[in-house]
Amino acid sequence: MARGMKLACVVLVICMVVIAPMAEGAISCGAVTSDLSPCLTYLTGGPGPSPQCCGGVKKLLAAANTTPDRQAACNCLKSAAGSITKLNTNNAAALPGKCGVNIPYKISTTTNCNTVKF
């Protein structure tokens, strides 16, 4: 549990540093990290996402209702994915579908967030 909290804090700090220069009212990496922190077990190879995880995914999708918001969220997800050392890339890519939502890109370190539109 302590290791997970430490990792979540590291992800939060990284996201805040990455998103700060591009923020103009867009979603913050802090919000993205907070919404998706219950997904950490699944993203590192654990069993299917928890109801709390899927609730966070749905909350994030509802909050990202403009192109800048979606691009900011994408950049936060991309950065967070790169900072999780044991990231299961298949689970990361499958997360939205497992939670019953559709986003127009894969959660991946190679996603081009500039092409994400509302």
From Swiss-Prot:
Give the residue range of the signal peptide.
1-25
- Disulfide cysteine pairs (residue numbers): C29-C76, C39-C53, C54-C99, C74-C113
The keyword Phosphoprotein belongs to this UniProt entry's keyword annotation:
no
Any idea which UniProt keywords this protein has? Answer: Disulfide bond, Lipid-binding, Signal, Transport
Which PANTHER family does its entry note? NON-SPECIFIC LIPID-TRANSFER PROTEIN 2-RELATED
Instruction: State the protein's purpose.
Output: Plant non-specific lipid-transfer proteins transfer phospholipids as well as galactolipids across membranes. May play a role in wax or cutin deposition in the cell walls of expanding epidermal cells and certain secretory tissues. Binds saturated fatty acids, jasmonic acid and, with highest efficiency, unsaturated fatty acids and lysolipids.
Task: Give the protein name, as stated in the record.
Answer: Non-specific lipid-transfer protein 2
Could you tell me which species this protein originates from? Lens culinaris (Lentil)
